Design a protein with these regions (language model features):
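Conserved acyl-donor/pantetheine-binding loop and adjacent beta-alpha core of acyl/acetyltransferases
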Residues: 82-122
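Helix-loop element at the rim of GNAT/NAT acetyltransferase active sites that forms part
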Residues: 14, 25-41, 54-55
Length: 122
């Protein structure tokens, strides 16, 4: 699908592995109800590691990007089935994250801790 208006042409296309960084950038720039989250957490990758990366890694066939002709500037991601996705998330995605993030040993207090709680308890 191609979207066009004066000065802007973009198309929706299937996600490609080379889009990973651009999708992460979009998530960082829009992760707070359309506002950016850069510098808000201890790492800018926190939100995309929770809300974009697992879908790109586990189910890339259910990911699409809005491409402006230079790079992905938007995305839509999904899963074929939540129970299977959650199982794969726990078995294949979480082990990759444990090198950078640690589960909480107490109830979450800060906004970042609440995000980590979501990460480790999908």
């Amino acid at each position: 699908m191609t979207l066009s208006r004066p000065g802007l042409t973009a198309k929706i296309r299937p996600y490609r592995a080379g889009d990973w960084a651009a999708v992460y950038d979009v998530c960082i720039e829009t992760g707070n109800a359309g506002q950016g989250v850069r510098g808000r957490y201890s790492t800018d990758d926190l939100l995309p590691d929770i809300f974009a990366g697992p879908y790109l890694y586990l189910e890339p066939g259910h990911a699409y990007v809005l491409d402006n002709g230079e790079r992905a500037v938007g995305y839509i991601i999904g899963t074929a089935g939540t129970p299977d996705f959650v199982a794969a998330y726990e078995e294949r995605w979480l082990p990759r994250l444990r090198t950078r993030y640690q589960p909480l040993s107490r109830p979450p207090v800060t906004e970042e801790e609440h995000r980590l709680d979501v990460m480790f308890h999908p």
